[in-house]
Design a protein with these regions (language model features):
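A structural signal for short, well-ordered beta-strand segments
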Residues: 153-155, 209-211, 282-286
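Residue-level recognition of short, solvent-exposed, well-ordered loop/turn junctions
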Residues: 255-256
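Non-heme Fe(II)-dependent double-stranded beta-helix
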Residues: 2-65, 71-189
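Active-site rim elements
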Residues: 122-128, 196-198, 246-250, 269-271
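A structural signal for short, well-ordered beta-strand segments and their strand-loop junctions
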Residues: 69-71, 148-152, 208, 222-225, ...
Length: 341
């Protein structure tokens, strides 16, 4: 759904943690009651947080649960520059949305959906995530090869005042063909013409790495992940039928500088941010060496040429050609909000 948005000429004058709670009374009784519930119940029991060199355990937990948390993936300097870039882009994006309508529900946004390239790889702070000394060995271990490729990178953020849950969802599907105005559009890439297998039966084809630029806690909108659902054929529960244990299956506590490595098929969703800080989780996304979907050009040539040899190999399918310029900026509609969000 696309909504007409009002611009916000004053957001530039606000600090990053003053941009939320627009049109929402954080002192309302129902908000305070929900906040208390989150403080009491949020957080996956026994959540393990690994160091980057614990490769065997990282891979085991990733394949068991469909996600894994690794701390100290970003150095202090890398964390600082990435957070500053996120803060800058949040302000730019909000300048188009005075009422904080969002593009993933009120006070909730996808960087990539808002971006005219579909990604944020035109920012060197995002591009550096393609080849981190701490992350590359993990991705090579998960895929069993260093020849995986980048899909791009964006991520999301939720503002203080995001009081609603995002429905559980998955970021993949079987191939779907849609006819529109005489043209056929294909979404997804895997289809078994025999009707025996579907994308959930495959080894991990597509991984998203979400980086924490602030500590993840019970009330600042931590992502919720339902362990072991990456291969599930059961229908995801609708939000109004979702049991409380799923709503509280949040990835917290986890420190800033960590990465949440996700098999995108696993059920996940956003949770309320009733804190006083913006929670952003910028990401990079990778495909297994054997998997492909349509790829969008999103890495400017000068940034591509600044990458390491491995970084260039990973990003070669999304890099601009020599002399090619990219249309960089945010859509006025911020990309619109998908149905159900």
């Amino acid at each position: 759904m696309t909504k007409w948005l009002q611009t916000d000429d004053q957001v530039q004058n606000l600090s990053i943690n003053e941009v939320g709670w627009v049109g929402v009374d954080k002192n309302a009784a129902e908000i305070q009651s929900l906040k208390q519930k989150l403080e009491q119940h949020n957080g996956i029991t026994g959540l393990q947080v690994f160091e980057p060199d614990e490769l065997e355990a990282i891979v085991d937990v990733f394949y068991r649960d469909g996600f894994v948390v690794v701390q100290n993936v970003l150095s202090a300097d890398q964390l600082s520059v990435l957070k500053a870039a996120c803060d800058e882009e949040v302000i730019k994006l909000l300048s188009k949305d005075k009422e904080r309508s969002g593009n993933r529900g009120s006070h909730r946004y996808s960087f990539g959906s808002a971006s005219r390239t579909g990604h944020m790889m035109h920012r060197p702070e995002w591009a550096m995530l393609l080849d981190l000394d701490t992350l590359t060995p993990i991705m090579s271990a998960i895929f069993g090869s260093s020849h995986y490729i980048a899909r791009g990178g964006g991520g999301d953020f939720c503002l203080p005042g995001a009081t609603k849950y995002q429905p559980l969802h998955s970021d993949m599907s079987n191939a779907v063909h849609h006819l529109h105005q005489g043209k056929t559009y294909t979404f997804g890439s895997f289809m078994d013409p025999r009707g025996i297998l579907n994308y959930r039966d495959l080894p991990t084809p597509y991984v998203c790495c979400n980086f924490l630029v602030v500590d993840s806690n019970a009330t600042n909108g931590p992502i919720r992940q339902i362990p072991g659902t990456q291969h599930s054929h059961h229908p995801m529960p609708k939000l109004d039928a979702e049991p409380d244990w799923m709503k509280h299956s949040t990835v917290n506590p986890a420190p800033a500088g960590s990465v949440i490595i996700r098999d995108v098929r696993a059920w996940h969703g956003g949770t309320p941010n009733l804190s006083n800080e913006v929670r952003a989780i910028p990401n990079v996304e990778f495909y297994a060496p054997w998997f492909r979907e349509n790829l969008l050009t999103s890495v400017p040539r000068d940034i591509f040429e600044s990458l390491s040899e491995h970084g260039q190999n990973v990003a070669k399918y999304i890099a601009a050609a020599e002399g090619q310029s990219l249309d960089i900026g945010y859509r006025n509609s911020l990309g619109g909000t998908p149905d159900g969000f």
